[in-house]
Amino acid sequence: MISPFLVLAIGTCLTNSLVPEKEKDPKYWRDQAQETLKYALELQKLNTNVAKNVIMFLGDGMGVSTVTAARILKGQLHHNPGEETRLEMDKFPFVALSKTYNTNAQVPDSAGTATAYLCGVKANEGTVGVSAATERSRCNTTQGNEVTSILRWAKDAGKSVGIVTTTRVNHATPSAAYAHSADRDWYSDNEMPPEALSQGCKDIAYQLMHNIRDIDVIMGGGRKYMYPKNKTDVEYESDEKARGTRLDGLDLVDTWKSFKPRYKHSHFIWNRTELLTLDPHNVDYLLGLFEPGDMQYELNRNNVTDPSLSEMVVVAIQILRKNPKGFFLLVEGGRIDHGHHEGKAKQALHEAVEMDRAIGQAGSLTSSEDTLTVVTADHSHVFTFGGYTPRGNSIFGLAPMLSDTDKKPFTAILYGNGPGYKVVGGERENVSMVDYAHNNYQAQSAVPLRHETHGGEDVAVFSKGPMAHLLHGVHEQNYVPHVMAYAACIGANLGHCAPASSAGSLAAGPLLLALALYPLSVLF
């Protein structure tokens, strides 16, 4: 076995050789800092325009450690060391932190958090679109405790609205935009207990089609929850698990079609080819359901049947932006979370890189003069990377040392808990004996669990566009939709608004500027 001291010595030599020549010159760093300072000084000219459009990107489980690791991966995919790379979200001028706890949970789940950042109120874990007065799985605590979302506020203001996700369209994050449910797992009536059904509660897929009937764009997975039980799936005809689940016999795709005016162009699609051949100018309503359940991981995607997140976002914006009153679009990179839960860091990080690609595409189709874009996460994960790795070390590679306890190597990426806990012959598994670069490799964890857990630390909030400066410090998570509504002059945020000028800005004047900067807690 190689001596740990020899490994460290080799690592030191390699580290010195990996420093790019330009970075050895102090002028490189000074010039870079001066450019950053110049940009920061320009931010003193605040953008107080009305946000005609609002786009919210939600990286499910995209904690700060995931953002950093995704940044390195993005650079390495372009054959760079990686650490110096800038994600699209890194370019946003304003950054805040969001406190993610649920009303009854120190470490949150994705349902209670979605209610916070979409509806503006904190809620109990496992519940969507309801206040903390609703208890999980108790249908009879729902009525009277429903809360509406920024998607509803935007639709009521005449804007077009859309939902794009890589999970099921009735999963926790998107469901808080339109549903009111005591349990996030009530995907269809097949997943609901008899008591809840008898008390009149509706499943989330049903609510998607009935609560806000004119959502302009809906894209993601979740086909099977829309069809009667045992109905064969259009793509996976021989797969019993892909068949319809509904006990009430409803075909919710037909329901969706029936609610659309005949003079409007409505399209239901189920594969990538259909999506990319659409003419957005001839689409008023779009329902795209590309998988029976969640969509495929980016690394596993079928390029014929499965669109990427960025492809869905481009089409969604092309459809929504036709509305002269603007739009609200919720985009979820939902499978970042799933990759982490499975201990598959490579899957999770490639999902994060794809979401960042979608952020870039959205930026190229919109202007920060009239579009507020917010990028954040619902919660973090117990995901970390370290081990004194040298510059440019593969983010999925080994640390440059051996454990001083069991004398075995370890990967830079590790989890605090999860399915990667493995004991071989009474000892920690020797990772040099396995393919730790495999797409589905499960990184080692300290505590054995079938599913890795969320983390409880704050998450980042990146913002650009009108009123983005109002996301500026450490906030409660439910503050986020209030800022978006204020910027767009929708919902309860109309008092400060005035007819827009040709540039789309708020009426000028010190009084209105002062109001824009006044603590929002006073206004709500």
UniProtKB/Swiss-Prot annotation:
The protein's GO terms of the molecular function aspect are: ADP phosphatase activity; alkaline phosphatase activity; ATP hydrolysis activity; calcium ion binding; inorganic diphosphate phosphatase activity; phosphoamidase activity; phosphoethanolamine phosphatase activity; pyridoxal phosphatase activity
Give the signal peptide as a residue range, or say none if absent. Answer: 1-17
Binding-site list for Mg(2+): D60, T173, E332
Positions where lipid (GPI-anchor amidated serine) attaches: S501
- Indicate which residues the UniProt annotation says bind Ca(2+): E235, F290, E291, D306
Q: Which cofactor does it need?
A: Mg(2+); Zn(2+); Ca(2+)
Q: Which UniProt keywords apply?
A: Biomineralization, Calcium, Cell membrane, Disease variant, Disulfide bond, Glycoprotein, GPI-anchor, Hydrolase, Lipoprotein, Magnesium, Membrane, Metal-binding, Mitochondrion, Phosphoprotein, Signal, Zinc
Q: What is this protein called?
A: Alkaline phosphatase, tissue-nonspecific isozyme
What species is this protein from?
Answer: Homo sapiens (Human)
